[in-house]
């Protein structure tokens, strides 16, 4: 039975609010996958239905290998989101936003998992 959702970037503002919403509205188990580059432990929600994993989305297939058959959907918010900092840390931005997102899409396609994706303001540049 698919009773698990994954929220990448689950320790950021949007991800943690989504987790809170799912806890109130569903009975699903939740995994937050976050590298804590901008997310924070302060956004953790103490609930036995939530598991927090520190990892980069680039490694999603390895990190979720044993759980993949239970995953109903992945909500992908785990990206390098700061516009100014994305230009200062271009390699980290490319790894997270391009390669990490590619890994998430590939994992979802290979395992027939629904993907809900939300880009960040960094993907639009300064004029976005």
Enumerate the predicted regions with their spans.
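N-terminal Rossmann-like NAD(P)+-binding domain of SDR-like oxidoreductases, especially those catalyzing
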Residues: 1-128
């Amino acid at each position: 039975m698919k009773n698990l959702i994954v929220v990448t970037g689950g320790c950021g503002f949007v991800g943690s609010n989504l987790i809170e919403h799912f806890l109130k509205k569903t009975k699903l188990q939740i995994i937050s996958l976050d590298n804590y580059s901008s997310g924070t432990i302060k956004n953790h929600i103490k609930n036995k239905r939530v598991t927090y994993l520190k990892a980069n989305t680039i490694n999603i297939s390895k990190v979720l290998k044993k759980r993949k058959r239970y995953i109903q959907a992945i909500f992908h918010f785990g990206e390098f989101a700061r516009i100014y900092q994305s230009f200062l840390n271009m390699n980290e931005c490319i790894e997270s936003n391009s390669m990490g997102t590619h890994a998430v899409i590939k994992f979802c396609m290979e395992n027939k998992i629904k993907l809900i994706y939300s880009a960040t303001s960094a993907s639009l540049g300064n004029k976005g």
